[in-house]
Amino acid sequence: IRQPVMNGVDLSCLKGVFSGGDSLSIELKKKFDKFLYDHNASVQIREGYGTTECVTASCLTPIHMAKEGSIGQPFPDTFYKIVKVGTTDEQPYGEEGEICISGPTVMLGYLDRPEETANTLRTHADGLTWVHTGDLGVMDDEGFVYFRQRIKRMIVTSGYNVYPSQLENIIDAHDLVQMSCVIGVP
């Protein structure tokens, strides 16, 4: 969107614009949606989520039903739940935990990696096999999922959990910042 070649380009032909693969900051989404609007697009960016273990995408923002910060709702026949990290205990709506996915596209396991398979695929009390994604998230009472970040990316400092993506969102909101990356330093 910063490239001069995009000045004056008519994007009214667009039918969809999608984002996945990592979190999209609220500020960047706002900037990109404004860019689309200013270039005659009738669409906004729709966020999605998925993992290799469930054959890519498994969640997407419904058309004209975006909720700020959400990656959308699970696809039909795909189930999401949030569990307390390191357990299979389901968290209540609005509580942060590990994103777990179950459904017909979930893998059978990693080839010749039984230990990794056992850590990732777990049978819960409901009898279903769930992919433990290693991602932190929240689900609201309407089934919208909010990706926070990879569990391994969390920084623990002075006994506090610090989420780099939250700090990056704040920094990225500044007009003079194009993009930021927060890392922990021992």
Residue spans of the language-model regions?
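Active-site glycine-centered loops adjacent to acidic/histidine catalytic or metal-binding residues
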Residues: 21, 50, 72, 103, ...
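Conserved beta-loop-beta connector loops within the AMP-binding
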Residues: 44, 81-101, 123, 139-142
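Short Gly/Pro-enriched turn/cap motifs at secondary-structure boundaries
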Residues: 69-75, 120-121, 127-129
